[in-house]
Amino acid sequence: MARSKIALIGAGQIGGTLALLAGLKELGDVVLFDLVEGVPQGKALDLAELSPVAGFDAAFAGTGAYEQIAGADVVIVTAGVPRKPGMSRDDLLAVNLKVMEQAGAGIAKYAPDAFVICVTNPLDAMVWALQKASGLPRHKVVGMAGVLDSARLRYFLADEFNVSVEDVTAMVLGGHGDTMVPLMRYCTVAGIPVPDLIRIGWTSTDRIEAIVTRTRNGGAEIVELLKSGSAFYAPAASAIVMAESYLKDKKRVLPVAAPLSGEYGFRDLYVGVPAVIGARGVERIVELELDRAERAQFEQSVASVQGLVDACAKIAPDLVR
């Protein structure tokens, strides 16, 4: 049986890590695309030479031509300008919007049947623009955000309780930014909700609120530490989880930036919600019942996303025609 083909648009830190993880998980052959001559080719060769050591079979190719992504089963878009210290994800909007238009056109021409995962920031607006530019079905284009945000929250909670990360579950909704909505009612340790752990004295409300704040600032914390560039290991691993669920039809329930069609009371936006990812792409959205406070936070987050989408529409009006 022929191996799946995974195309990575952007061969930077995230793209290179994605290629490595795809190889290690034996998800398929990999094409690295980047406009910087030599970078995708060099990384592809390095990864190919790693495969005998790591013990996997996969073909790696580097290119600066979109035609080389032809027939890709999965396309993961990471291309764009990363954040620098002091910048928010929103500061990247105008320049990365142009990248999404170019990537969308390339995907539409050469990989129209692919499942597309957007990683580029500001995420919720960029995945919206990428779907508009590509014209692909909305359920075949998603954004990577909630998996990463929830993973950060899981790690912080595991550290707080001094337990294995494997026993911690977490759920983060809303936009991939300062207004994201961590839902503590749905965060558990071995099935025990965090609010119950507060009641039995394992932690305090103040400490949990500090963890929520740290989760919202998780990306910025890494940007400040690195000084140049942004997180790449965890974002790549998060996108690979989504790709694997699609390629293997695992039907995992993952928090992703998914297209809303009335769920949660919103339409025509990509917002972070739990969704089933399988061979048909976004197969179902899980619509949680939110209490009054959660609903207010979620609506604030959606309003932030809407503002970014409106800004995209003003910069590139052809996307909404």
Swiss-Prot record:
Residues that, per the record, bind NAD(+): 10-15, 34, 96, 119-121
InterPro entries associated with the record: L-lactate/malate_DH, Lactate/malate_DH_C, Lactate/malate_DH_N, Lactate_DH/Glyco_Ohase_4_C, Malate_DH_type3, NAD(P)-bd_dom_sf
Annotated source species: Azorhizobium caulinodans (strain ATCC 43989 / DSM 5975 / JCM 20966 / LMG 6465 / NBRC 14845 / NCIMB 13405 / ORS 571)
EC number: 1.1.1.37
Entry keywords, A to Z: NAD, Oxidoreductase, Tricarboxylic acid cycle
Function according to Swiss-Prot or TrEMBL: Catalyzes the reversible oxidation of malate to oxaloacetate.
Residues forming the catalytic site: 176
MF-aspect GO terms: L-lactate dehydrogenase activity; L-malate dehydrogenase (NAD+) activity
Full protein name: Malate dehydrogenase
Binding sites annotated in the UniProt record for substrate: 83, 89, 121, 152
Catalysed reaction equations from the record: (S)-malate + NAD(+) = oxaloacetate + NADH + H(+)
SUPFAM superfamilies: LDH C-terminal domain-like (SSF56327), NAD(P)-binding Rossmann-fold domains (SSF51735)
GO biological process: lactate metabolic process; tricarboxylic acid cycle
